[in-house]
């Protein structure tokens, strides 16, 4: 089996990996699934995914909700401000937050399939407040791309052929907060297909500091 040790050695030989990231990951094997074979994963993306799996995570007060984990903060409750960017057709995370904390969740996703899904969801208008807008580091009408390899729409134009596009309005996080009447965020979740880092840099520049951030970091334009 071609292990991660082999991959890291190859990367070092070609000068594309910093030695300090080694440590305990060297003996971890890489296993492949059918999804790996038929999807266009880059070499760097697989290395990042395998490395992240080795990171130590504090499990104290860590609670799983749907596909994500958060710190089970006693301050979270019915009055908490919770933003969830990137809905798709799965709101199990948001549903469990509502059940556990009795809170309202503000959900955002401009993709057509998500708009239809949320219009039909029983919690929309009750504990869910849904807006069909995207979040970005600038305001404007933007193009979303669907990769040939499948997955979700992304703001980043893929290197490979796309099979669909659509235009949607995007706002910055501070604009969304202002229009919603919020000055702070207790929990921010972003699963926005490679666009999270620019948003987080914009947050840093503007001094937006949520109490908790749950973010999925993808390699864009793959």
Model-inferred region functions:
Residues 1-222:
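Phosphate/nucleotide-binding beta-alpha loop and adjacent structural elements of enzyme active sites
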């Amino acid at each position: 089996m071609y292990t991660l040790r082999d991959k890291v050695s190859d990367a070092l030989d070609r000068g594309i990996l910093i030695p300090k990231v080694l440590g305990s990951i060297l003996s971890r094997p890489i296993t492949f699934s059918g999804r790996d074979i038929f999807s266009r994963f880059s070499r760097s993306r697989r290395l990042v995914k395998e490395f992240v799996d080795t990171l130590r995570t504090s499990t104290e007060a860590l609670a799983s909700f749907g596909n994500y984990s958060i710190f089970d903060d006693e301050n979270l409750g019915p009055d908490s401000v919770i933003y969830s960017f990137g809905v798709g057709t799965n709101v199990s995370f948001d549903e469990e937050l509502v059940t556990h904390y009795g809170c309202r969740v503000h959900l955002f996703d401009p993709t057509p399939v998500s708009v239809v899904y949320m219009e039909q969801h029983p919690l929309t208008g009750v504990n869910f407040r849904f807006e069909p807008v995207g979040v970005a580091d600038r305001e404007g009408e933007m193009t979303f791309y669907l990769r040939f390899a499948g997955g979700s729409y992304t703001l980043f134009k893929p290197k490979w052929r796309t099979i669909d596009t659509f235009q949607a309005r995007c706002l910055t996080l501070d604009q969304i907060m202002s229009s919603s009447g919020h000055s702070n965020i207790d929990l921010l979740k972003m699963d926005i297909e490679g666009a999270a880092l620019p948003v987080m840099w914009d947050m840093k520049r503007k001094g937006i500091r949520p109490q908790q951030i749950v973010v999925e970091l993808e390699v864009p334009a793959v």
